[in-house]
């Protein structure tokens, strides 16, 4: 559920004030992540790497109060649940957007991910969750990108993270490649 709140009564009061006056309120950070253990868990539990990575992003975000807040049209809204957005290759060769409600239950999250992404891929219809704070993600696995910079628009003001193909070394796996 989405509820308007007074930004002055939150830990984000100053950030909200600065955000509302900024022409492009965005900071882009890039970092190499060692995902060796995540890849090992993925293989051991036979869970697709991107499903597990999206679940970990949701798990981390669910423990941070600020991830439930979203500035929109000059107001601040608080959501009571999260969703993860993924980009899906569809059957026509294009891409579609798919929001997946976050749950702490990894098995349920995996089955929801598989069912929803398969449905979106087949139907070529975007699937959006309107009553949840959506964290944008994308696995651009056909590229070897190191960073994606998102241009702010008032249509997409939610947090976003994107990654390319993971890089396997002899003893380590990283996102993206270390220079």
Segments (PLM) and residue ranges:
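Broad gene-expression machinery/nucleic-acid interaction feature
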Residues: 26-28, 81-85, 134, 160
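Helical lid/core segments from catalytic subdomains that handle acyl or acyl-like groups
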Residues: 90-147
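Catalytic micro-motifs at enzyme active sites that drive phosphoryl/nucleotidyl and oxygen chemistry
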Residues: 15-16, 72-76, 150, 163-168
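Short secondary-structure capping/junction motifs at helix and strand boundaries
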Residues: 64-71, 122-127
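N-terminal beta-alpha "docking/capping" segments at the starts of catalytic domains
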Residues: 1-47
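Small-residue-rich loop/turn and linker elements
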Residues: 67-99
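Glycine-rich active-site loop/lid that clamps phosphate-bearing ligands
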Residues: 140-164
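Acyl activation and transfer enzymes in specialized metabolism, enriched
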Residues: 39-63, 161, 165, 171-179
């Amino acid at each position: 559920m989405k509820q308007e709140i007074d930004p002055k009564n939150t830990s984000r009061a100053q950030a909200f004030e600065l955000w509302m006056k900024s022409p492009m309120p965005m900071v882009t950070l890039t970092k190499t992540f060692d995902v060796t253990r995540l890849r090992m868990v993925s293989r051991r539990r036979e869970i697709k790497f991107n499903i597990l990575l999206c679940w970990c992003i949701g798990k981390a975000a669910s423990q941070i109060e600020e991830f439930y807040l979203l500035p929109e049209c000059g107001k601040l809204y608080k959501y009571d649940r999260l969703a993860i957005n993924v980009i899906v290759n569809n059957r026509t060769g294009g891409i579609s957007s798919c929001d997946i409600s976050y749950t702490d239950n990894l098995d349920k999250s995996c089955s929801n991910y598989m069912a929803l992404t398969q449905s979106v891929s087949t139907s070529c219809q975007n699937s959006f969750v309107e009553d949840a704070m959506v964290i944008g993600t994308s696995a651009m696995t056909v590229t070897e990108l190191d960073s994606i910079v998102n241009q702010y628009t008032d249509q997409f003001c939610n947090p976003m993270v994107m990654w390319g193909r993971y890089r396997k070394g002899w003893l380590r796996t990283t996102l993206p490649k270390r220079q």
